[in-house]
């Protein structure tokens, strides 16, 4: 009987142990260190060793392997292999299903692997290797017309591949890798700069004995954290196999032009490869033949995760994985049977901890409804640990579990796995809901008749939405506009609005969106407040020019129209129009299947206003040192800085339904979606009385960048932050994200949404008018002569906010 030692503690190792335990030739399986999944398997056969496979523990692992009569070692992760664990066990006569330290260079050094591919004519992107950062930067600056991928040479904890979008990002990537050594000393010694390729990426796992090989089904991984391949890179959020894009002819090409030359090349170079070869490829369309051509992106020298969970689930019942691994380790792979059940497809969905791939909580209790799992489904554990004292399974990592289902076709496997995911419960769990979407994008077109509705566009839904929102739109009527919708546009009568023909009237336009605040609305299901935001961002930009907003048009784009979501959004737009006194005269609702992931939408708005020539703001020529700066309170974060907001929320791993840290009466989602304040009706009286010199709408850039936009270059705004109490929301974000004070001042409004520039003698009249409207007003500071090379706005008492 075989006694096997498996190294690692992820879902990859759990599925390996599960498959190995099915062999009738296996006695005991030891796992170092293992996880909650292996800890709760049959204790008479599967035993966890609380030993991490670090270099410092190699001797101990060797000693215990000898003591427990281990016949085969199966390393899971790459680091033990790169660090030479194979020779540690070979030295005491124990076979290892894994490459030597020399062969592991295929993964350990990207420079080595690129040179190897070049030497053996294996298709890959063109590249250069640099050992000097200045030379690398010079190369990039000389080729700004080309797109590149920049790779740190070593393992770099899986994070050393950067796809820059500008020359500045490229230069910074070189500095991060080679100068500040952010990915480690070894990884930063040299850098690979290679041509950027576009296309479908696929993964192929190949079992190799140094001479012969067996290709497992091709898989496709999903690296990004969010649906639609958005957000940060992860270790992998799901996979499926076989990938339909890998046609039989393409598989033959991959085997003959990539896999076999790799195995033969390694052997001929004196480092025969044993173990599993992971080949990551991209399929690039040949401009001459219009055929997909595979090119190698990377090699790994171990099983991939989560591809392994899907691929090994497709082995047929006659395949004894323990004997396969042993045969490969002993260079006799052709002596054993390996079979794939080619009648089935497999899909794996990773369930992660909230906040992953950044900070996340550990120690949350996991409940698995295993009795409710659909057939042909398994849960493989990764970031888990078993607490024997309480007989509980707890979270202990970012990627917590992998749920894998197989079925007779891919669509059924997808449907099954998402039913199975409902059987997994722990606090703040998260998973992608679009695993395998590329397979259906690439599937052959159906021969049945296709209607416009079949394409994903519902004319009926559009008409129903118009009927739903008509009353909301009518509620925004004002003199000059009837605010009816359904036609080809909207009319506005300036005379009815009070602007006479003999007056010098100018029209003013503004267009804006809501930004990434929309993502939070979509994740929380709160859609009405961002409609107010959309109006506010536009009409506030009109009023700072002295203009009265007259009418508004909105644009709402989505992949699949949800009438309730769109109606909620338009209700917010109508609310904002009522608050600002402008008419909602029309808009566009655009349903574009495939453009946006499920549940996502984008929006934009345009406002048009009018102003008499003599009332145009700012009155720069009338401003002078000594003029007063007044501030009006904001309602919160408004609509700027939400990329930072989301980054901090991910960092602290708070769910949107958690109690709001700065307002316990609300959830976090409700608190952060507080709509932008509209400042129109309260400011128009002072504008018409010509009491104001200028206005600054405090948006992205904060006080320090927005006030200078409203004053002449020779003047400087001095703002004293001790004149108002900064709201708790900004202090909380500053503390939670440890945000530098300069950064937070250039990102958020800090409690002041609008700044007024007023002559000293007009301050009382302006304040009286605003007080009648219920406004909170602060005297923030004043204008002074601007010293040479000094900034346009100086903040005082802004360094002890939190």
UniProtKB/Swiss-Prot annotation:
Note on how the cofactor is bound: Binds two magnesium or manganese ions per subunit.
UniProt KW keywords: ATP-binding, Cytoplasm, Ligase, Magnesium, Manganese, Metal-binding, Multifunctional enzyme, Nucleotide-binding, Phosphoprotein, Purine biosynthesis
Binding locations of Mg(2+): 298, 300
GO molecular function: ATP binding; metal ion binding; phosphoribosylamine-glycine ligase activity; phosphoribosylformylglycinamidine cyclo-ligase activity
Entry GO CC: cytoplasm; cytosol
Keyword NADP in annotation: no
Phosphoserine, modified sites: 455, 458
Catalysis: reaction(s): 5-phospho-beta-D-ribosylamine + glycine + ATP = N(1)-(5-phospho-beta-D-ribosyl)glycinamide + ADP + phosphate + H(+); 2-formamido-N(1)-(5-O-phospho-beta-D-ribosyl)acetamidine + ATP = 5-amino-1-(5-phospho-beta-D-ribosyl)imidazole + ADP + phosphate + H(+)
GO biological process, one term: adenine biosynthetic process
Positions of region (AIRS): 451-802
Residues covered by region (GARS): 1-450
Amino acids binding ATP: 141-203
EC number: 6.3.4.13, 6.3.3.1
Keyword Metal-binding: yes
Listed pathway(s): Purine metabolism; IMP biosynthesis via de novo pathway; 5-amino-1-(5-phospho-D-ribosyl)imidazole from N(2)-formyl-N(1)-(5-phospho-D-ribosyl)glycinamide: step 2/2; Purine metabolism; IMP biosynthesis via de novo pathway; N(1)-(5-phospho-D-ribosyl)glycinamide from 5-phospho-alpha-D-ribose 1-diphosphate: step 2/2
Span of domain ATP-grasp: 114-330
Enzyme category, top tier: ligase
Other observations noted: Present with 35800 molecules/cell in log phase SD medium.
Official protein name in the record: Bifunctional purine biosynthetic protein ADE5,7
Native source species: Saccharomyces cerevisiae (strain ATCC 204508 / S288c) (Baker's yeast)
Upper classification of the organism: Eukaryota, Fungi, Dikarya, Ascomycota, Saccharomycotina
Gene from which the chain derives: ADE57
